[in-house]
């Protein structure tokens, strides 16, 4: 029986955080045995906002090395760079012609990004969800791991696939959202009611995977808890968001359950909790960074991973694009 196909992509812009790792990357690693996983570094999406060319190239290789350091295995999964497989852009253009202006106008992420990048509201930013649909539909994807911010885009991908299939027959699989069984939702350190984000302007809210572990310890020790007197280490997201966030992080790193941790810190001060979280996270990052630097310093290996991944991806992508071109009436290339 063939494994279900899972597709996920991440931009090479901005450093990945422990939130990305605990909430997504670790789940990707665990999925590799049960699913046919396709992981894409979406550099074409990245240029919808202005990029420095040199920094973008570096960030792409950094992201690839980080994926490998986190445990994505190129022997088990297909991992590649979006611009290395031209079928993404080719299908994206075709799907533009089956997507309505009104649908794209309603995308909340376009509205948010337009407000943030008012000096560069470009057509690529507007059509971003169509290219995302092409990314997914090219591989006859069954499942797409999505966060809250991408749910609307996946719904559009499903609508486009169903619209196209209604016209031309079953060309595309209609993808379903995939919600992993577990995955910590890591919140901002100083504003624990909002999710930790790699694009947060206040870097004290964020722990990057490549950050100096000593700096991480300082940030965690400054993290928000609460003013209860005496202090009570208890999991209560509603009333003790900061303490709950620290417990979530510690549980994700150590594997201990929340009730076990509550018992462990019974009668202890918040400083004890912060110290344990700081030690656990800095230890995890030290090991991860050692693996990262090993991969990042071997550029020949990274080039080979990208080449092999693009070749594997192209086999699937070209098959789908051929079916699409035939359906819409393009003359086959001699």
Swiss-Prot record:
Which keywords does this Swiss-Prot/TrEMBL entry list?
Answer: Aminoacyl-tRNA synthetase, ATP-binding, Cytoplasm, Ligase, Nucleotide-binding, Protein biosynthesis
Any one Pfam family here would be tRNA-synt_1b
- Enzyme's top EC category: ligase
* Locus of motif 'KMSKS' region: 195-199
What SUPFAM superfamilies does the entry give? Answer: Nucleotidylyl transferase
- Extent of motif 'HIGH' region: 12-20
Q: Give the matching Gene3D superfamilies.
A: HUPs (3.40.50.620), Tyrosyl-Transfer RNA Synthetase (1.10.240.10)
Q: Which InterPro entries match?
A: aa-tRNA-synth_I_CS, aa-tRNA-synth_Ic, Rossmann-like_a/b/a_fold, Trp-tRNA-ligase, Trp-tRNA-ligase_bac-type, Trp-tRNA_synthetase
The record lists the catalysed reaction(s) as: tRNA(Trp) + L-tryptophan + ATP = L-tryptophyl-tRNA(Trp) + AMP + diphosphate + H(+)
What does the entry list as the binding residues for L-tryptophan?
A: 135
Q: Does the keyword Protein biosynthesis apply?
A: yes
Q: Which domain of life is it from?
A: Bacteria
**Cystines in this chain:** none
Its subcellular locations are: Cytoplasm
Coarsely, its chief localization is cytoplasm
Q: Which GO terms describe its molecular function?
A: ATP binding; tryptophan-tRNA ligase activity
Kindly list the positions annotated as binding ATP.
11-13, 19-20, 147-149, 186, 195-199
Instruction: Report the EC code(s) recorded for this entry.
Output: 6.1.1.2
Q: What does this protein do?
A: Catalyzes the attachment of tryptophan to tRNA(Trp).
Q: Its quaternary structure?
A: Homodimer.
Question: What is the name attached to this protein's record?
Answer: Tryptophan--tRNA ligase
Gene expressing this chain: trpS
């Amino acid at each position: 029986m063939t494994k279900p196909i899972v597709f996920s992509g991440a931009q090479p812009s901005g450093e990945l955080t422990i939130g990305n790792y605990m909430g997504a990357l670790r789940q990707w690693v665990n999925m590799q045995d049960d699913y046919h996983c396709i992981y894409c570094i979406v550099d074409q999406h990245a240029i919808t906002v202005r990029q420095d060319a040199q920094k973008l190239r570096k960030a792409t290789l950094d992201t690839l090395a980080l994926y490998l350091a986190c445990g994505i295995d190129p022997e088990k999964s297909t991992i590649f760079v979006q611009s290395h497989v031209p079928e993404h852009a080719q299908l994206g253009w075709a799907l533009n012609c089956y997507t309505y202006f009104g649908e794209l106008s309603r995308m909340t992420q376009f509205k948010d990004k337009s407000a943030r990048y008012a000096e560069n509201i470009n057509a690529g930013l507007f059509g971003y969800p169509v290219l995302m649909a092409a990314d997914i539909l090219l591989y006859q994807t069954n499942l797409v791991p999505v966060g809250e911010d991408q749910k609307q885009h996946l719904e559009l991908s499903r609508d486009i696939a169903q619209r196209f299939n209604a016209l031309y027959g079953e060309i595309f699989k209609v993808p379903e959202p995939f919600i992993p069984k577990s995955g910590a939702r890591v919140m901002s350190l100083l504003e624990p009611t909002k999710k930790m984000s790699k694009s947060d302007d206040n870097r004290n809210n964020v722990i990057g995977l490549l950050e100096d572990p000593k700096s991480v310890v300082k940030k965690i020790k400054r993290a928000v808890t609460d003013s209860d007197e005496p202090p009570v280490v208890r999991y209560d997201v509603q009333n003790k968001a900061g303490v709950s966030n620290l417990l979530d992080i510690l549980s994700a790193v150590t594997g201990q359950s929340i009730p076990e941790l509550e018992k462990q810190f019974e009668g202890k001060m918040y400083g004890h909790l912060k110290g344990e979280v700081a030690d656990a996270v800095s230890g995890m990052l030290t090991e991860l960074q050692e693996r990262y630097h090993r991969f990042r310093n071997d550029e020949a290996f990274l080039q080979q991973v990208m080449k092999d991944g693009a070749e594997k991806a192209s086999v699937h992508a070209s098959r789908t694009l051929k079916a699409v071109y035939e359906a819409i009436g393009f003359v086959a290339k001699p």
